[in-house]
């Protein structure tokens, strides 16, 4: 993950203001240490609740930055896919945590020693990596909302123009696409699109200007979308694609654990709300509570 996110450090753009709830973390650590659930086959709910809350906050922020309000069904799709991504992230996190339970002789470490060993690794999961994911969710949810507008306007503004990055230090890989104008349904947009690199700040604008030629790519292998970003979130509602390492290269049992957890705990299209004082979900039926039925409700 460090290699994947290496170039994503954001020193000039999105302000990723979040704090991972320590009460949730401490409950999760206690549960993992006491082996009250199986990290290979289950999803730790406190870690999930907090991760999903933060990714949802990023999505809210990104949508608020777009000039287009998305409809309820598309917002539900974003929320549901964010829940799936959060569950995969937590499966990776909880198994990384559990892998440090025993010393080199296979003996269970004392709880405080184990926590001391775990915290440097947790800094990656709940700080560095999550910050990159937060910033990316902000940018890509804004792009997703923009795409919804492009679809609605395509009878009047049928083409899209790739706009120059707003970054003070833009990467050279997208520069060849600046100024390209193509129809919204052109296959080019399936393989190249703003937001397919970590921390990309390029964008699209709808236009009735005539289409340009498809640009030649001198380095097609180098200009492939980054793993986890090789999709159009405005079409499928996934801010992180299925090629993300949490999903494509997860621990054994990750896909089955996530499938079971989502089916049991997450109503499609819901937003999860947690009472951190009690550590319990606010829905007494066994599934997480739907806290809104409208985008801004």
Placement of each model-derived feature along the sequence:
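Intrinsically disordered or highly flexible coil/loop and linker segments, enriched in small
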Residues: 38, 64, 106-107, 127, ...
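N-terminal leader/targeting and assembly helices and adjacent pre-domain segments
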Residues: 1-122, 208-297
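Internal glycine-rich, Lys/Arg-flanked active-site/core loops of soluble domains
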Residues: 103, 112-115, 119-136, 140-156
């Amino acid at each position: 993950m460090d290699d994947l996110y290496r170039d994503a450090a954001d020193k000039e753009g999105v302000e990723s203001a979040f704090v991972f709830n320590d009460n949730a973390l401490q409950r999760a650590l206690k549960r993992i240490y006491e082996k009250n659930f199986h990290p290979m086959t289950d999803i730790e709910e406190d870690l999930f609740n907090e991760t999903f809350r933060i990714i949802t906050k990023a999505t809210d922020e990104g949508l608020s930055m777009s000039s287009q309000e998305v409809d309820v069904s598309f917002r539900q799709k974003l929320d549901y896919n964010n829940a799936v991504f959060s569950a995969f992230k937590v499966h990776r996190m909880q198994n990384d945590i559990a892998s440090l339970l025993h010393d080199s002789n296979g003996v269970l470490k004392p709880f405080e020693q184990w926590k001391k060993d775990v915290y440097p690794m947790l800094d990656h999961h709940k700080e560095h990596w999550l910050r990159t994911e937060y910033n990316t969710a902000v940018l890509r949810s804004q792009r997703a909302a923009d795409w919804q507008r492009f679809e609605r306007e395509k009878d009047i503004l049928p083409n899209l123009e790739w706009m120059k990055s707003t970054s003070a230090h833009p990467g050279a890989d997208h520069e060849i696409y600046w100024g390209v104008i193509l129809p919204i349904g052109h296959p080019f947009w399936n393989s190249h699109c703003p937001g397919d690199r970590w921390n990309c700040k390029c964008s699209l604008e709808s236009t009735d200007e005539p289409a340009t030629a498809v640009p030649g790519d001198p380095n097609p292998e180098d200009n492939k979308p980054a793993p986890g970003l090789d999709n159009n979130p405005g079409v499928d509602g996934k801010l992180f694609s299925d090629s993300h390492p949490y999903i494509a290269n997860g621990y054994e049992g990750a896909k089955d654990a996530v499938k079971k957890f989502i089916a049991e705990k997450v109503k499609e299209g819901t937003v999860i709300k947690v009472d951190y004082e009690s550590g319990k979900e606010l829905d007494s039926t066994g599934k997480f509570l739907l806290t809104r039925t409208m985008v801004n409700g």
